[in-house]
Amino acid sequence: MMRYALGVEYDGSEFLGWQQLGEMGPSVQATLQQALASVADASVRVVCAGRTDAGVHGQCQVVHFDSAVTRPPRAWILGTTTRLPSSVAVRWCVPTSEDFHARFSACARRYRYRLLNRQVRPALQHQFLSWERHPLDAQAMHVAAQMLLGENDFSAFRSAQCQALHARRELQAISVRRYAEVIEICVQANAFLHHMVRNIVGSLLMVGTGERPMEWIAELLAGRDRTMAGPTASARGLVFVGPLYPAKWHLPMEVSV
């Protein structure tokens, strides 16, 4: 058996999320596995670096799979992509060792959240942008966000459905920047809880509108009470930028540190 790592890009708008959930609806996982199976002429199961929810997009999701069939990387890339819908594409393929694991070998994961901050909702690229009509203070949001850095208990920002054994995560970097009418929030952590990014964004938006002071974010973190935090932000503006791996795995630069 040969193990391969793939970099996968997808528009999550038409999917119920990454994970295959029986017959409930289309998933990125099932769609990718079906295309890979056609190339391998055998069933294929993929393991991803980070599962995404319904409507969340993937810029460079990393997966691994095992196959008894040997194909050159170009064949896996082109053969699989031609069998995928236009919303999913395989960007790269790297043969790797059986010790590599898309999830457990990753040392960090990155997300980006983008929203349009103007009076009128977006018509173009609306599936990739959230929207907030009230003026936002991006600098206040950025300062408040820095209070979340480090290893902390993020219970205030986890969903009620989160199945993680504990809520401690290391938030390694977070920034809030304005580019004309677009606010961009970038987050990196060793791992994330269910809805963690969207819940953080929802609370930062309340700081941005002036509804809450910057110090409120630190109070939420210390309080560990989800019911006291802001609402969950829309999935529409969220992109899983991708995981990061140690250089020893010899993966493309965009996912290596």
Curated annotation (Swiss-Prot):
Pfam families: PseudoU_synth_1. One of its GO terms (biological process) is tRNA pseudouridine synthesis. Coiled coil: none annotated. Keywords: Isomerase, tRNA processing. Substrate binds at residue 111. Formation of pseudouridine at positions 38, 39 and 40 in the anticodon stem and loop of transfer RNAs. This is tRNA pseudouridine synthase A. It comes from Xylella fastidiosa (strain 9a5c).
